[in-house]
UniProtKB/Swiss-Prot annotation:
Quaternary structure annotation from Swiss-Prot or TrEMBL: Homotetramer.
Sites where the protein binds FMN: R124, A125, S126, G286, K301, P302, T303, A304, T305, R327
Protein name in the entry: Chorismate synthase
Role noted for this protein: This reaction introduces a second double bond into the aromatic ring system.
CC cofactor: FMNH2
GO process terms (BP): amino acid biosynthetic process; aromatic amino acid family biosynthetic process; chorismate biosynthetic process
Family the entry assigns: Belongs to the chorismate synthase family.
Recorded metabolic or biological pathway in which this protein acts: Metabolic intermediate biosynthesis; chorismate biosynthesis; chorismate from D-erythrose 4-phosphate and phosphoenolpyruvate: step 7/7
CDD domains: Chorismate_synthase
Pfam family, one: Chorismate_synt
GO molecular function term, any single one: FMN binding
Keywords of this entry: Amino-acid biosynthesis, Aromatic amino acid biosynthesis, FAD, Flavoprotein, FMN, Lyase, NADP
E.C. number(s) listed in UniProt: 4.2.3.5
Length: 362
């Protein structure tokens, strides 16, 4: 319950942060897709902990094992199972949270719902759950690149009150990965890194915004009413840990425009594809992709687990204080970039198969 996502291109993730491992079962991947396992590992390397001075110091290789569904480098069309073993757990760092709820963390709500919780490491609420999503998203990415040349690139747009202005039409993954904060604006990236370090040294945390662009998306993805493409994109990225907001296209800023200013005028094209003079719609109209770049933004809250002492209650409902130990990101955004890309790729792959199944018979 609650650990599966997708309709035809469907994933189910499993595992806890301090259990034996985490992983995913992917169903619905088309057969005979030439799969590059190094590309899967590369995405996990972008997500893994301990990669820089502004991420958690937990050391995990996050080496993926493909257990089924692939033979001689080709997908079989059968379920693809992948697992990553946990190696660097420290349950002793979580003694305090075994009896006191972390403010704004899932501890209290998991306990209220289930009457039990995996408090060491956060269990299913830990960002380690996203390993399976990133691995499956890497397969979706390869499928979309092969079929349509689709390119999904995300980057850190804002950290705290520092915001970068990035041209979504030209930004490259190489520019994003050129620094540890994953902001393609080098000058702003340096300021963001300094800000994260300063806040982390104070025992605190900060949030921000990730922006993501889909270039060369397939046309016609999405369905009317409840399965609109932007609705599924919102559900996908909002299921990631620490997310608190979603925008597409002009987003909330579009409310300041008049219809005559906001409408994307259609233009003639030589190839018969839809072209627009602007892209306030963010590449989706009526819930269906129009072929223009899809542009979304995702807000991430400050990391809930911090070293600063906070007011809370214990498991008996009594007032107490908590200064959390353990190894935690002072800011989740640098490692969340591949997570956002993965969820976008998964949604697009799923809707592509649904589009092919319904609308490509004749």
């Amino acid at each position: 319950m609650g650990s599966s996502f997708g309709t035809l291109f469907r994933i189910s993730t499993f595992g806890e942060s301090h259990g034996g491992g985490v992983g995913v079962i992917l169903e619905g991947c088309p057969p005979r897709l030439e799969l590059d396992p190094l590309a899967i590992q590369a995405e996990l390397d972008r997500r893994r902990p301990g990669q820089s001075k502004i991420t958690t110091p937990r050391k995990e290789a996050d080496q993926v094992e493909i257990l089924s569904g692939v033979m001689d480098g080709l997908t079989l069309g059968t379920p693809i199972a992948m697992v990553v073993r946990n190696k660097d757990q420290r349950p002793q760092d979580y003694k305090e949270v075994e009896v006191a709820f972390r403010p704004s963390h899932a501890d209290a709500t998991y306990q209220a719902k289930y009457g039990i919780q995996a408090r060491s490491g956060g269990g299913r609420a830990s960002a380690r759950e996203t390993i399976g999503r990133v691995a499956a998203g890497a397969i979706a990415r390869q499928m979309l690149q092969r079929s349509h040349g689709t390119d999904v690139v995300a980057w850190v747009k804002r950290i705290h009150d520092l915001e970068a202005q990035v041209d979504a039409s030209t930004v490259t993954r190489e520019a994003v990965d050129a620094n540890i904060v994953r902001c393609p604006d080098a000058e702003m990236a340096d300021r963001m890194i300094d800000r994260i370090e300063a806040i982390g040294q104070d025992g605190d945390s900060c949030g921000g915004v990730i922006e993501c662009v889909v270039r060369r998306p397939p046309v016609g993805l999405g369905m009317p009413v409840f399965d609109k493409l932007e609705a599924d994109l919102a559900k996908a990225v909002m299921s990631l840990p620490a997310t608190k907001g979603f925008e597409i296209g002009s987003g909330f800023a579009g409310t300041l425009l008049r219809g005559s200013e906001h409408n994307d005028a259609f233009l003639p094209s030589d190839d018969g594809r839809l072209r627009t003079a602007s892209n306030n719609s963010g590449g989706i109209q009526g819930g269906i992709s129009n072929g223009e770049p899809i542009v979304i933004r995702v807000a991430f809250k400050p990391t809930a687990t911090i070293r600063k002492e906070q007011q809370t209650i214990n498991d008996r409902g009594e007032a107490t204080t908590l200064a959390a130990k353990g190894r935690h990101d002072p800011c989740v955004l640098p490692r969340a970039v591949p997570m956002v890309e993965a969820m976008v790729n998964l949604v697009l792959a799923d809707h592509l198969l649904r589009q092919q199944g319904q609308c490509s018979l004749w």
